[in-house]
A protein has these predicted regions:
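Transmembrane helix-loop-helix hairpins at membrane boundaries of multipass inner-membrane proteins
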Residues: 2-14, 20-112, 188-196, 496, ...
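Short helix-boundary/re-entrant hairpin motifs in multi-pass inner-membrane proteins
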Residues: 62-65, 93, 160, 164, ...
Length: 670
């Protein structure tokens, strides 16, 4: 046991050292090859460290420095190891493939940003004091911005990056305020003293819960913060999206979960109120995000909004766990907590697969637009298998890991009906209804992405995906199925994660042999492991019927029907807009769609030379929240700028007033 703990500690130190060296090397090396090798090796060491540590946790490692008179310590819990493992699996592939930036300088910048982001994410997962945690949080944000700048896909990347950083800094201020309030109550900046689980809930604890939700929700994309996702992701490459939707999202969620489940009170009406707000915020985020994802026509933007949707689902289930815990149901709360971890693991693998596919699509088509080009016809079958498994998981289709996590989510909500009180039960009911809508739209979204984005007649391109990319997509996509099929054994790694927080090993009650059960096999059960055996056998029936039928009925290929006229199938193929137009029209109160048709004439109004069609979807929060805030800040800036008068006496007076204020605080604040 001691040797394993020592090996785990050494592996974590080596991982961080490799990433730190890679950041420095990326800035001075001519081509960035060594930086890439260092980051890939660091990811491999990190994955090995997670495998060594699971199930269990790392020992507390002192880094030998102090911040604000608090020793900086590092420790990865069982949940942190789980999220780190499934975040690093896609990251190692994206580090190997790299960005598709055209310039060498851009690639070097991207690798430097990747190293910073990984260091920050691991710091968020493991650092044990407020000061170093905030440094890691900001490092993760800045690293992400550097990655987008390195990609160089947008003509003006500054606007989306600054919008992203601006909203993230709003969250950072909320986190800072929450940590200051918690530190003031604990008398220390160490997270060890933040444990107020047994304290009585007060309005202050309710405020702390909201601050944590706002702070970490800014990174997770909880409304209204998800509006930075499409622009920021759309300005970078798919490789950047892999990191953002993988280890970064996992780290932000873990920080939020640690805050609400370990730092805040677990009983009282104020706790239940904060949990209810978290549930509604998560469900509404998931609904709005997936609706907006469905109408997107860009791979990166669609997948980014899907990431916000999955983060919203995870936050909603986390709120359910908190509410169940406050209601005196620790076993059901532990079930919800483990379901969150399963959901994020499946999401990291599937989303990483599709972001890598998006970069391959860009290399073939020259853009990330979702359009039929028949890419699968000209590429190996393993590419389609990997992408299909990922799309099925995100659409919650059996037997993929996404289906397993969604099934567990609804079973958790059904268990949630055991709570006492009409408001709590009504919250569970509305959450179940909202998430059911999310699942339905997600199915349509990924049917559109896979069907239009990868299928078609196949007569446009003769090029193929790079072999390394094809292999990465297949391995990552297949790992989604491996996670689902091996779920009875994977759950063993999550027992300590629930035991440490809830005092209940819920993972042991979530499996019965090859069956997956929600705490009891008398409530419900599924078995992805058995599905893998049975489904291929059942598939033999339609395959046999097809083979028999082909003897009597020969295959005919005829042109697509188009009003009785012969049209080029490529010209009348289903477009992304056509696929989503029905839902866009039905839910027009959400989308606020606008269409604009302009005509250019030649020699009079009867001779149309060109039609220009433009369609847009009105943003929900932009005109009503962000724009008024920007205008208000500009007015404040104009008012404050009058203080810059150039008169030295005025400046001295302001300094004197500030000193008096500081003295007053020192004398009267207790």
């Amino acid at each position: 046991m001691f040797k394993e703990a020592k090996l785990l500690t050494d592996a974590l130190l080596l991982m961080a050292l490799l990433w730190l060296i890679s950041v420095v090397v990326a800035l001075i090396e001519p081509r960035g090859t060594m930086a890439r090798a260092g980051i890939v090796l660091g990811c491999a060491v990190g994955i090995a460290a997670c495998l060594i540590g699971m199930p269990g946790e790392s020992s507390t490692l002192s880094l030998g420095i102090r911040l604000s008179n608090t020793p900086v310590q590092f420790k990865l819990t069982a949940a942190a190891l789980w999220l780190m493992f499934f975040g690093l699996l896609p990251a190692i592939f994206t580090a190997r493939l790299g960005t598709n930036a055209t310039s060498i300088g851009g690639r070097k910048c991207w690798y430097a940003g990747l190293g910073l982001t990984l260091l920050g994410a691991v710091g968020v997962l493991g650092l044990q004091d407020a000061m170093s945690f905030l440094i890691a949080w900001e490092t993760m944000s800045i690293g992400g911005a550097v990655m987008i700048f390195g990609d160089g896909h947008a003509e003006c990347p500054g606007t989306p990056v600054l919008f992203m950083l601006g909203l993230l800094e709003v969250g950072a201020v909320a986190i800072l305020l929450a940590l200051l309030l918690l530190g003031n109550q604990a008398g220390s900046c160490s997270f060890v003293g933040f444990h107020l689980a047994n304290a009585a809930a007060t309005p202050m604890s309710f405020l702390l819960g909201l601050l944590l939700l706002i702070g970490f929700g800014a990174k997770l994309g909880i409304l209204p913060f998800y509006e930075w996702f499409p622009a920021a992701y759309g300005s970078g490459s798919g490789a950047t999206g892999v990191v953002f939707s993988g280890i970064v999202l996992n780290a932000a969620f873990y920080a939020l979960a640690r805050g609400v489940l370990e730092w805040l009170p677990r009983v009282g009406i104020w706790t239940m109120s904060a949990a209810g707000i978290m549930i509604f915020a998560g469900v509404l985020t998931a609904i709005l995000s997936i609706f907006n994802a469905f109408q997107e026509e860009d791979w990166r933007r669609m997948l980014s909004l899907s990431s916000a949707e999955n983060a919203g689902v995870a936050v909603a289930v986390l709120g359910v766990s908190w509410l169940l815990l406050a209601s005196g149901l620790p076993a059901q709360a532990a079930l919800a907590w483990i379901v969150c971890l399963l959901h994020l693991a499946a999401h990291s693998l599937a989303k990483g697969t599709l972001f890598l596919t998006a970069d391959g699509v860009n290399s073939m088509n020259g853009s990330y637009t979702i359009v039929q080009r028949g890419l699968l016809r000209n590429n190996p079958a393993v590419l389609g298998i990997g992408a299909l498994f990922a799309a099925m998981s995100l659409a919650a289709l059996p037997p993929m890991a996404g289906f397993v996590s969604e099934w567990y989510i609804f079973q958790t909500l059904f268990h949630g009906m055991q709570v006492k009180g009409l408001p709590a039960r009504l919250t569970m009911t509305l959450a179940a209804a909202g998430l059911a809508l999310v699942v339905a739209v997600a199915l349509a979204t990924f049917a559109k992405l896979f069907g239009i984005g990868l299928l078609g007649d196949g007569h446009v391109h003769t090029r193929r995906f790079a072999r390394v990319r094809t292999a990465a997509i297949f391995i990552l996509g297949s790992s989604v199925l491996v996670l689902a099929v091996g779920m009875p054994w994977w759950l063993h790694a999550l027992g300590p994660a629930s035991q440490a927080i809830f005092g209940v090993n819920a993972a042991a009650q979530m499996r019965d042999g090859w069956l997956l059960v929600p705490l009891s096999n008398k409530f419900a059960f599924i078995s992805p492991t058995k599905m893998l055996v049975v489904c291929p056998l059942l598939a033999l029936i339609p395959i046999a019927l097809l083979l028999i039928g082909r003897r009597a009925f020969h295959v005919r290929r005829v042109p697509v029907w188009s009003g009785g006229r012969r049209e080029d199938a490529r010209e009348i193929a289903t477009t992304s807009l056509a696929f989503s137009n029905a839902l866009r029209t039905f839910y027009g109160f959400i989308y606020g769609p606008t269409h604009n048709l302009e005509r250019e004439y030649d020699h009079g109004p009867y001779f149309v030379k060109r039609l220009i069609f433009n369609q847009e979807v009105a943003p929900i929060f932009g005109p009503y929240l962000f724009s008024p805030l920007v205008k208000a800040m500009r007015r404040v800036a104009e008012t404050v700028s009058k203080l810059q008068s150039g008169y030295l006496n005025l400046y001295n007076a302001l300094i004197g007033m500030l000193l008096v204020l500081i003295l007053a605080l020192a004398l009267f604040y207790k």
